[in-house]
Curated annotation (Swiss-Prot):
This is Kelch repeat protein C2. Kelch repeats lie at residues 216-261, 262-307, 309-354, 356-403, 405-449, 452-498. The lineage of its organism: Viruses, Varidnaviria, Bamfordvirae, Nucleocytoviricota, Pokkesviricetes. Keywords: Kelch repeat, Repeat. It holds the Pfam family Kelch_1. Residues 102-176 form the BACK domain. Coiled coil: none annotated. Residues 2-67 form the BTB domain. Gene3D superfamilies: 1.25.40.420, Kelch-type beta propeller, Potassium Channel Kv1.1, Chain A. It comes from the Viruses. The keyword Repeat applies. Transmembrane segments: none annotated. Belongs to the poxviruses Kelch family.
Length: 512
């Protein structure tokens, strides 16, 4: 019986010539055309046992592929050009991809030009980017490869601070490519992380590129009323889905988002004032009732800062209160601050540089009802008076933008809405052009380059150009609307001394 002789790494395999003749694959057809009878055909880059497995496949149309031998069989099948075995091997590898081997498979797919495996391994890296940073192969990714991964719209990061930590870990292994830091969008980062990067001697250039990472974009939480029950829904920019988080039967409450949880504060249930504060985790949808506030109240003003929820003023039955208190996220004790100079409800409160500003609202007793224009600032553990608003307003919505305050007023006694800018450093109010008039609830959020206003429609106000955009949107029955970025970055005053500890804490929190 005639045989064809193959030499692999010095080992000899004799193959029945009939198997070679019957083979439909190009490699063996070329052997039929050019093989000289007494010469051994030398095969380079192929494993001896993998070649035996291919010969078994040609004889019996069966092959034993496992996670342990798949790579060597796939390499042999590519070199010998046996497409059915290539497909079987690729399917096996894709089926077994996980966060611990996806970078290795990614590199393997590039080396041998396997598109399906490349796409599957890239998808695994994108979905598990924080986990794969622990792989020793992570630091060997090229600058262009990591840029492609982190620029993908579906990369699984929920805050730009996480992106920053991924880059810092890679830069530690690739110090000559520090300019990759410029893929960051500083406006989506916390001040703490920006300060840390600056202390490392790195400079992030102002980016004009569009934001591609959906996960760092603003989440949305909306509460809509229907038949006395309000439904809470959450929109994730990464999944692009709305999900129902739960329901609440409160009225006249306030709400705010802190550490990816929605807090629902005070208000009334069945026409009775309540002390309680409920919290729902927007990711797990789990509810928790946190410690009661110091008193029964509705129509409070709330703001958040440094992991704390602040509740200011409100209406205790028919009397406005000056109580100010805060609850640190994850704790169970309310801490009292000094009372407001003027008790009020329905005013606005906002943080600027760790100081609280409270403005407008209503002061009421059993005998009095006074619409306010005064402004108070809590700084150095006391309330002080600031320049009053140009007019008296019972309802005020306010946000901080670029170190100043922008306030929009509601309509009750007034005949129109007003837009003001409070210049903090000058203690000065100026009136700006107001694009619309709306009777009813409004919701105001600071969103990077613009301020979002939800009223009878969706409005975007751009402070730097003093211009407006209008978008049609159904706002019927909306009781609460907020946009937020997920923020779990450890808060601290970052200095050269505390920098290593801060970065270590961030790595433990974000990348492990």
């Amino acid at each position: 019986m005639e045989s064809v002789i193959f030499s692999i790494n010095g080992e000899i395999i004799q193959v029945n010539k009939e198997i070679i003749t019957a083979s439909p694959y190009n490699f063996f057809k070329r052997i039929q055309d050019h093989h000289l009878k007494d010469e051994a055909i030398i095969l380079n880059g192929i494993n001896y046992h993998a070649f035996e497995s291919l010969l078994d496949y040609m004889r019996w149309k069966k092959i034993n592929i496992t996670i342990n031998n798949v790579e060597m069989i796939l390499v042999a099948a590519i070199i010998i050009d046996v497409p059915p075995v290539v497909d079987l091997c690729v399917k096996t590898m894709i089926h077994n991809i996980n966060s611990t081997n996806c970078i290795r498979m990614f590199n393997f797919s590039k080396r041998y030009g396997i598109k399906k495996l490349y796409n599957a391994s890239m998808s695994e890296i994108i979905n598990n980017i924080t986990a794969v940073t622990s792989d020793p192969e992570f630091g060997k990714l090229s600058k262009d490869e990591l840029t492609t991964i982190l620029s993908h719209e579906d990369v699984n990061v929920n805050h730009e601070d996480v992106t920053a930590m991924i880059l810092l870990k890679w830069i530690h292994k690739n110090p000559n490519d520090v300019d990759i830091i410029n893929i960051l969008h500083p406006k989506f980062m916390t001040n703490t992380m920006r300060n840390a990067i600056s202390l490392l001697g790195l400079t992030i250039s102002k980016s004009t590129k569009p934001v591609t990472r959906n996960g760092i974009k603003h989440n949305i939480v909306v509460i809509k009323n229907s038949d006395y029950i309000s439904t809470i829904t959450h929109y994730s920019p990464r999944t692009e889905y709305w999900t129902i988080v739960g329901n609440t039967d409160r009225q006249f409450y306030n709400a705010n988002v802190l550490h990816n949880c929605l807090y629902i504060i005070g208000g009334m249930i069945n026409n009775r004032h309540v002390y309680s504060v409920s919290r729902v985790d927007l990711k797990t949808k789990k509810w928790k009732t946190v410690t009661n506030m110091s008193s029964l109240k509705s129509e409070v003003s709330t703001c958040v800062n440094d992991g704390k929820l602040y509740v200011i003023g409100g209406l205790e039955f028919s009397i406005s209160t000056g109580v100010a208190e805060y609850l640190k996220h994850g704790t169970s004790k309310w801490i009292r601050l000094p009372n407001l100079i003027t008790p009020r409800y329905s005013g606005a409160s906002v943080f600027v540089n760790d100081d609280i500003y409270v403005m407008g609202g209503v002061y009421t007793t059993y005998e009095k009802y006074v619409v306010l224009n005064d402004v108070e600032c809590f700084t150095k553990n006391r309330w002080i008076k600031k320049s009053p608003m140009p007019r008296h307003h019972s309802i005020v919505y306010a946000v901080e933008y670029d170190g100043d305050i922008y306030a929009i007023t509601g309509i009750t006694h007034e005949t129109r809405n007003y837009l003001y800018k409070y210049i903090v450093k000058e203690d000065k109010w100026i009136e700006l052009y107001m694009y619309f008039n709306h009777v009813g609830k409004m919701f105001v959020c600071s969103c990077g380059d613009y301020i979002l206003i939800i009223a009878d429609a969706k409005y975007e106000y751009y402070p730097k150009s003093n211009t407006w955009n209008l978008f049609d949107m159904s706002t019927r029955n909306i009781e609460y609307y907020d946009m937020f970025t997920k923020d779990e970055t450890p808060k601290c005053n970052v200095t050269h001394k505390s920098l290593p500890s801060f970065l270590s804490n961030c790595e433990k929190q974000f990348l492990q």
